[in-house]
């Protein structure tokens, strides 16, 4: 029996790792065996204009945000790359042999890219976005998954409510490259005919015929669900997420607390109260929210004094969430950046090298914060109009989710004090409106310096530190 390997603490993440010959030991990949962490192939199912691409994009964004490398493969885009100019619905007729040949070629090209992503590039989840309306096509994709050691999970979107279908058709017509510069009525007519091309051969997932498959069926954008054979943790998270999202029009308002006494001094963390300007901002925020005349607005804060003081000025009920508390800076709490550089120069440099994954000694990383904030995202997806009064790092994490920002970009998103961001979800993304409430505040944003080397001089480490008292 081999002797136990030596452990050493990773300086960036502060986790213990086995070492071999002075180097971190890597876990052997066992992709051929379907373990809990083997790749997952999500297969969309449904007629056109049923919200499949909306679901695909939203699911991809969520999984990437929680740290699961995910990519969407839209077969329609592969078709557009091959057939440069879309002419009419006749391309999709079941007796159009040339069309059938090209569509199959596109599906196989997309699956080839799925294999490359999951088996060679370190991807964990691939979302295969196409109609996949026949049992034969789904069997082909399932076999592809089995041959490559992937778990396959089907997501079917069914819409029978004519109002939902009509709304989806408008969204598709507005956003599809197939109908750019086409007359609106002509585009609608063509798209309706395209849907008819699929309807006669459409075979929905069946509780008896498909009882061995893992799937979720979503009826009328979340009115009801059928869930079958959820196989592992990642599939259960996918189901939970899909059962929380909705398409009701709403806005989410994000802002930080008013300027705090420690903000003025350039000190991070702590639990200080508001500065005089911070209290002034609270009054301006109350007036802004009143002027917006928002129906059934929910207000959430952290459990820290500065967010609660800010919310008190609104004179409305609010809910305190511990998970909305600011990132825990551990041993660096209430220190200035200059003091951190002076006392912990190695830590300061490591954080600049990888700000997302760096964990403060006895504290948290942005990566930890994202995991902590997942329940907030789930609840924001369930709710309608919400104002979240939070903190700089927390606001960055929430903003990165809604704007689909990469982990490397997340810790540098600008979230200034005394500014409200109004987020309005739209078809395949989020519209952002930034509203400054005309109360001056200190700048707390620090850009990544050019020199992130451990041996850098102090003046180069501190070059991007904002001015403070």
From Swiss-Prot:
UniProt catalytic activity: beta-D-fructose 2,6-bisphosphate + H2O = beta-D-fructose 6-phosphate + phosphate; beta-D-fructose 6-phosphate + ATP = beta-D-fructose 2,6-bisphosphate + ADP + H(+)
Binding site for beta-D-fructose 2,6-bisphosphate: 256, 263, 269, 306, 337, 351, 355, 366, 392, 396
Annotated ATP binding sites: 46-54, 168-173, 348-351, 392-396, 428
Superkingdom per UniProt: Eukaryota
Region named Fructose-2,6-bisphosphatase: 250-469
One Pfam family linked to the record: 6PF2K
Active site feature: 129, 159, 257, 326
Residue list for modification Phosphoserine: 29
Keyword list, A-Z: ATP-binding, Hydrolase, Kinase, Multifunctional enzyme, Nucleotide-binding, Phosphoprotein, Transferase
Site positions per UniProt: Transition state stabilizer: 391
GO biological process terms, semicolon-separated: fructose 2,6-bisphosphate metabolic process; fructose metabolic process
Residues recorded as bearing Phosphothreonine in the entry: 444
Record keyword Phosphoprotein present: yes
Binding site for beta-D-fructose 6-phosphate: 79, 103, 131, 137, 173, 194, 198
Chain residue ranges for the region called 6-phosphofructo-2-kinase: 1-249
Subunit record text: Homodimer.
Role description: Synthesis and degradation of fructose 2,6-bisphosphate.
PANTHER family assigned to the protein according to its UniProt record, in alphabetical order: 6-PHOSPHOFRUCTO-2-KINASE/FRUCTOSE-2,6-BISPHOSPHATASE, 6-PHOSPHOFRUCTO-2-KINASE_FRUCTOSE-2,6-BISPHOSPHATASE 4
Protein name, UniProt field: 6-phosphofructo-2-kinase/fructose-2,6-bisphosphatase 4
Source lineage: Eukaryota, Metazoa, Chordata, Craniata, Vertebrata
């Amino acid at each position: 029996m081999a002797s136990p390997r030596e452990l050493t603490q990773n300086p960036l993440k502060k986790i213990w790792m086995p070492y071999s010959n002075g180097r971190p030991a890597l876990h052997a990949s066992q992709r051929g065996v379907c373990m809990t962490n083997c790749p997952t192939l999500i297969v969309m199912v449904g007629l056109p204009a049923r919200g499949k691409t909306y679901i695909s994009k939203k699911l991809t964004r969520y999984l990437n945000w929680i740290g699961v490398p995910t990519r969407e493969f839209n077969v329609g885009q592969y078709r557009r790359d091959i057939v440069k100019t879309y002419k009419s619905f006749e391309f999709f007729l079941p007796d159009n042999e040339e069309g059938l040949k090209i569509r199959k070629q596109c599906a196989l090209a997309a699956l080839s890219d799925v294999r490359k992503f999951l088996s060679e590039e370190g991807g964990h989840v691939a979302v295969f976005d196409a109609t996949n309306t026949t049992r034969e096509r789904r069997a082909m994709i399932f076999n592809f998954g089995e041959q490559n050691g992937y778990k396959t999970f089907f997501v079917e979107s069914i819409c029978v409510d004519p109002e939902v279908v009509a709304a989806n058709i408008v969204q598709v017509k507005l956003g599809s490259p197939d109908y750019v510069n086409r007359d609106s009525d002509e585009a609608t007519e063509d798209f309706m005919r395209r849907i008819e091309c699929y309807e006669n051969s459409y075979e929905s997932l069946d509780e008896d015929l498909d009882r061995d498959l893992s799937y979720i069926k979503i009826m009328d954008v979340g009115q009801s669900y059928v869930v079958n054979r959820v196989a592992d943790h990642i599939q259960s998270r996918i189901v939970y997420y899909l059962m929380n999202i909705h398409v009701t029009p709403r806005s989410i308002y994000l802002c930080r607390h008013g300027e705090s006494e420690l903000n003025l001094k350039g000190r991070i963390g702590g639990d200080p109260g508001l500065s005089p300007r911070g209290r002034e901002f609270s009054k301006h925020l109350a007036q802004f929210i009143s002027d917006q005349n928002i129906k059934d607005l929910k207000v959430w804060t952290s459990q820290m004094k500065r967010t609660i003081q800010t919310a008190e000025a609104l004179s409305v009920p609010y809910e305190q969430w511990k998970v909305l508390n600011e990132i825990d800076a551990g041993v660096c709490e209430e220190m200035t950046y200059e003091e951190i550089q002076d006392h912990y120069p190695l830590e300061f440099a490591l954080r600049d090298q990888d700000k997302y994954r760096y964990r403060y000694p006895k504290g948290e990383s942005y990566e930890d914060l994202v995991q902590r904030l997942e329940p907030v995202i789930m609840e924001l997806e369930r709710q309608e109009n919400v104002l979240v009064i939070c903190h700089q790092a927390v606001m960055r994490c929430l903003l990165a989710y809604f704007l689909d920002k990469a982990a490397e970009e997340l810790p540098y998103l600008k979230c200034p004090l005394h500014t409200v961001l109004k987020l309005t979800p739209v078809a395949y993304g989020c519209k952002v409106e930034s509203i400054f409430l005309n109360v001056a505040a200190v700048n707390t944003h620090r850009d990544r310096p050019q020199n992130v080397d451990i041996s850098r001089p102090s003046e180069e480490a501190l070059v991007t530190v904002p001015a403070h008292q």
